[in-house]
């Protein structure tokens, strides 16, 4: 009987129960495991995280309005955006940036992108003065040097055709004396260019012919609009130069 009682006591002890000498059952209390407090204090403000910033009601209303206008998810994103925009002023006032380095690099890239887009929308007269632009891109320096070299080495005919006076149709024979133009440029400009690029004798002949045949040229044009190429008038009637040659005994 004693052996059985000892075995029963051992089984009871394994179950967490103790049997007293009187035969009463006593529940054994399990050992309580004490948890260690966390090493990191979650209530402390790490780098201002979770802080409530007090601001005037006007500023708070403006931040709330900007959050909706910019499509941000929270007011914190709007304040972060405002800090990025004001970073140059912050650096100018404090000497150092108050935002992390990652924000600084991002803001620099954002500012570079905004500057490039703003420059693209500006007119070319404000960007390069007289610098030529092709589809928003400036002509390279080597092309400029080649163009200047070509302009310096061209002959008289090319220099004459690059003038903005328009297209001139000059007869091959000087005795015809007809000068027709598409642009309707004044004849003084043409005579001045002829003075620089042709012989003085030919210029003198042109002046005499134009003075002598002023009325005949006006009558020959007829109903044609001035400033247009009137080849029909010069081909239909005899030229005053040919009339003068018939009358001249020479």
Swiss-Prot record:
Disulfide-bonded cysteines: none
Compartments, record wording: Nucleus
A Pfam family that the UniProt record links to this protein: TCP
InterPro entries from the UniProt entry: TF_TCP_subgr, Transcription_factor_TCP
This protein's UniProt keywords: DNA-binding, Nucleus, Transcription, Transcription regulation
PANTHER family: TRANSCRIPTION FACTOR TCP21-RELATED, TRANSCRIPTION FACTOR TCP4-RELATED
The protein's name in its UniProt record: Transcription factor TCP7
Species in which this protein is naturally found: Arabidopsis thaliana
């Amino acid at each position: 009987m004693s052996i059985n009682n000892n075995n029963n006591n051992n089984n009871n002890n394994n179950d967490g129960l103790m049997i007293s000498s009187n035969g009463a059952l006593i529940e054994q209390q399990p050992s309580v495991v004490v948890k260690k407090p966390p090493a990191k204090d979650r209530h402390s403000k790490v780098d201002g995280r979770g802080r409530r910033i007090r601001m005037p009601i006007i500023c708070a209303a403006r931040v709330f309005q900007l959050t909706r206008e910019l499509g941000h998810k929270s007011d914190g994103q709007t304040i972060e955006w405002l800090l990025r925009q004001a970073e140059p002023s912050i650096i100018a006032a404090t000497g150092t940036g108050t935002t992390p380095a990652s924000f600084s690099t991002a803001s620099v890239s954002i500012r570079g992108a905004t500057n490039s887009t703003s420059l693209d929308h500006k007119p070319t007269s404000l960007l390069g003065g007289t610098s030529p632009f092709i589809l928003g891109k400036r002509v390279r320096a080597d092309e400029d040097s080649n163009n200047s070299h070509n302009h310096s080495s061209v002959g008289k005919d090319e220099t004459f055709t690059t003038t903005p006076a328009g297209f001139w149709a000059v007869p091959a024979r000087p005795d015809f004396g007809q000068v027709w133009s598409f642009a309707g440029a004044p004849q003084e400009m043409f005579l001045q260019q002829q003075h620089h690029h042709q012989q003085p004798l030919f210029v003198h002949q042109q002046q005499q012919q134009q003075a002598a045949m002023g009325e005949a040229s006006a009558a020959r044009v007829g109903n044609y609009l001035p400033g247009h190429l009137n080849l029909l008038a010069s081909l239909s009637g005899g030229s005053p130069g040919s009339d003068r040659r018939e009358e001249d005994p020479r």
